[in-house]
Regions:
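Juxtamembrane membrane-interface segments at transmembrane-helix boundaries in membrane proteins
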Residues: 5-10, 126-144, 209-224
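Alpha-helical transmembrane segments forming the membrane-embedded cores
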Residues: 169-259
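Cytoplasmic juxtamembrane interface segments
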Residues: 7-21, 67, 79, 152-177
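A surface-exposed beta-alpha-beta supersecondary segment
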Residues: 29-32, 43-137
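Hydrophobic secretory-pathway targeting helix
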Residues: 2-40
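Membrane-embedded alpha-helices of multi-pass membrane proteins, especially ion channels
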Residues: 22-36, 155-163, 188-195, 233-243
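Physicochemical signature of membrane-embedded alpha-helices that form the seven-helix bundle of GPCRs
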Residues: 14-24, 137-154, 173-183, 187, ...
Length: 259
C-alpha cells in the first residue's frame, strides 16, 4: 500500500512541481500589476521606472528656488514611481499614490519654472508627475500582463484537474495544456520584452530629452518579477510537452505488450 502510494505520488511529482511554479507566477504577476497602487512599502516599491530631479544638474538650484518661492519646501527631492496602473509620488518622506488616469490631486502642484524669458515674461515649466504619467499611459500597457494572469490561472486549474485521480476527459485536457503552455510562455515572453524595452526607453529618452535635469532609475524588483515568471513559464511548457510524450510512449508500450 505504501509503495503504491509512493509510486503514485512520484509519477505526479513533475505536474505538482509545475503547479507550484504556476502558483508562484500568479502571485508574482499580480503583485507586478498592482505595483504603485497603494502607499504601502510592498506595493510602492514595485515600480517600472522612478523619476527624480538630478541633483548634479546645473538647473537643480533653480528648481529648488522655484519650489521655495511657492512654499513647497522639499519638493526638489520629489520622486515619481510608475507602475502598470498607478503612480506613486514621494515628497518629504510621504508617499501618495493615484491612478495614472486621474492625477488631479497633483495638478498644478509639482510643475516647476525652470527658465524665464525676460522679453515677454513667459516661462518654461517642467512637471515631473505629468511626464511620468505620459510614460505610463502611452508606453506601458497592462493588457498582456492581465491576459497572462488569466491564462496562468486557467493552466493551473487544468493541470490540477489532471493530477486529481478518477476524473474523466483528461486526454482532452492534456492536449489543451499542450497548446496553452507554449502559448502562455510566448505571450509573457512578449510582455517581458515589451516591459524591458519600455523601461530602457523611459530611462534613456527622458534623461536625454531633459538634458540631464531628470534622473530615471529602472525598478530592479519589477524586472525580477517580470523575468522570473517567464523562466517558470518556459519550464512549465517544456514539462507539459515532455510529460505528454512520456505518457504517449507508455501507452504505445502497453499496447505493444498486448499484441
Amino acid at each position: 500500500m505504501f509503495i503504491t502510494a509512493a509510486l503514485f505520488s512520484l509519477k505526479r511529482m513533475p505536474r505538482i512541481f509545475m503547479l507550484i511554479l504556476l502558483f508562484i507566477n500568479v502571485f508574482l504577476l499580480a503583485f507586478l500589476l498592482l505595483g504603485c497602487t497603494t502607499d504601502t512599502e510592498t506595493y510602492s516599491s514595485t515600480y517600472l521606472v522612478k523619476y527624480s530631479f538630478n541633483k548634479s544638474s546645473a538647473i537643480y538650484p533653480l528648481i529648488k528656488s522655484s519650489y521655495s518661492s511657492k512654499n513647497f519646501t522639499g519638493y526638489e527631492d520629489i520622486s515619481v514611481r510608475t507602475g502598470y496602473l498607478s503612480l506613486c509620488v514621494d515628497v518629504d518622506n510621504e508617499t501618495a499614490c493615484a491612478s495614472r488616469s486621474d492625477l488631479t490631486s497633483f495638478k498644478n502642484i509639482t510643475a516647476v519654472d525652470i527658465y524665464t524669458v525676460n522679453s515677454n515674461s513667459s516661462s518654461t515649466t517642467l512637471d515631473i508627475v505629468s511626464l511620468a504619467a505620459e510614460y505610463s499611459n502611452e508606453i506601458v500597457h497592462p493588457y498582456i500582463l492581465i491576459a497572462s494572469i488569466i491564462l496562468t490561472i486557467i493552466l493551473f486549474l487544468s493541470l490540477l484537474y489532471i493530477v486529481i485521480p478518477g476524473l474523466l476527459g483528461k486526454h482532452f485536457v492534456t492536449k489543451f495544456n499542450l497548446v496553452l503552455a507554449p502559448v502562455l510562455a510566448l505571450l509573457w515572453g512578449l510582455g517581458a520584452m515589451w516591459e524591458h524595452v519600455a523601461s530602457k526607453a523611459g530611462k534613456s529618452l527622458v534623461e536625454k530629452a531633459s538634458m540631464g535635469i531628470i534622473k530615471a532609475d529602472i525598478g530592479l524588483k519589477a524586472s525580477a518579477m517580470t523575468w522570473t515568471p517567464f523562466t517558470f513559464f518556459v519550464i512549465v511548457a517544456i514539462g507539459v510537452i515532455g510529460l505528454y510524450f512520456r505518457d504517449l510512449n507508455e501507452i504505445i508500450e502497453a499496447v505493444d505488450s498486448k499484441v
